[in-house]
Amino acid sequence: MATPASITNVTVEFLQFPALVTPPASTKSYFLGGAGVRGLNIQEEFVKFTGIGVYLEDKAVSSLGAKWKGKSAAELLDSLDFYRDIIKGPFEKLIRGSKLRTLDGREYVRKVSENCVAHMESVGTYSEAEEKAIEEFRNAFKDQNFPPGSTVFYKQSPTGTLGLSFSKDETIPEHEHAVIDNKPLSEAVLETMIGEIPVSPALKESLATRFHQFFKELEANPNIEN
């Protein structure tokens, strides 16, 4: 399948998310499904912490389009199943989380892991194996500090492996810092970003808007699936 022609770069604050990325030592490119800001309301002010971009393997458009083409952007945005199909889809994903303000690695991973555990417990996938995976996940971040512009990359495979790498800018490192083989945890990481209780509603909206355009292109040119 060809990469959608309608794909564009996205800017989140001072962060640039290019339309395509190719990791080092790889011939495979990933396209930008969407990007948005993650923040919290603190004392009646929305404080922005991170810009998140979700990149996908090119076959994701045809895979998702089989079910979702023809839907409006608003319909996609309102459908949790659409986002769950992204999360659980049989294609690789590369998530880029770049910092807008300084974050301590331990504090960052504490909140992320709490959200992941809460989701896994709610859907009944949190067992001893996931508890061990969460411990590995936390250990990977314990010595990290993230100044503005630095990045965490999460590489997700359909089989359930979660690769973690850290960069002082937006450059994808050649080697992963850690690889955790646990599908419930891998899915939970993206679920907490774009699922039922998302940390980035802006990312969800970006995905819906952009995939609506990708699906229109797919309908106009069915050969794009080949």
Swiss-Prot record:
InterPro entries assigned: CFI, Chalcone_isomerase, Chalcone_isomerase_3-sand, Chalcone_isomerase_bundle_sf, Chalcone_isomerase_sf
Regions that span the bilayer: none
Amino acids binding substrate: T50, N115, T192
Molecular function per GO: chalcone isomerase activity
EC annotation from Swiss-Prot or TrEMBL: 5.5.1.6
Residues the UniProt record annotates as site (Important for catalytic activity): Y108
Organ and tissue specificity: Expressed in roots, shoots, flowers and seeds.
Induction trigger: In roots by B.japonicum.
One of the Pfam families matching this protein, by short name: Chalcone
Chemical reaction(s) catalysed: a chalcone = a flavanone
SUPFAM superfamilies referenced in this protein's UniProt entry, alphabetically: Chalcone isomerase
Biological role stated in the UniProt entry: Catalyzes the intramolecular cyclization of bicyclic chalcones into tricyclic (S)-flavanones. Responsible for the isomerization of 4,2',4',6'-tetrahydroxychalcone (also termed chalcone) into naringenin.
Miscellaneous comment as given in the Swiss-Prot or TrEMBL entry: Part of the biosynthetic pathway for all classes of flavonoids, a large class of secondary plant metabolites, many of which are brightly colored.
PANTHER family, per the entry: CHALCONE--FLAVANONE ISOMERASE 1B-1 (PTHR28039:SF9), CHALCONE--FLAVONONE ISOMERASE 1-RELATED (PTHR28039)
Family stated for the protein in its record: Belongs to the chalcone isomerase family.
Protein name per UniProt: Chalcone--flavanone isomerase 1B-2
Species for this entry: Glycine max
Upper lineage: Eukaryota, Viridiplantae, Streptophyta, Embryophyta, Tracheophyta
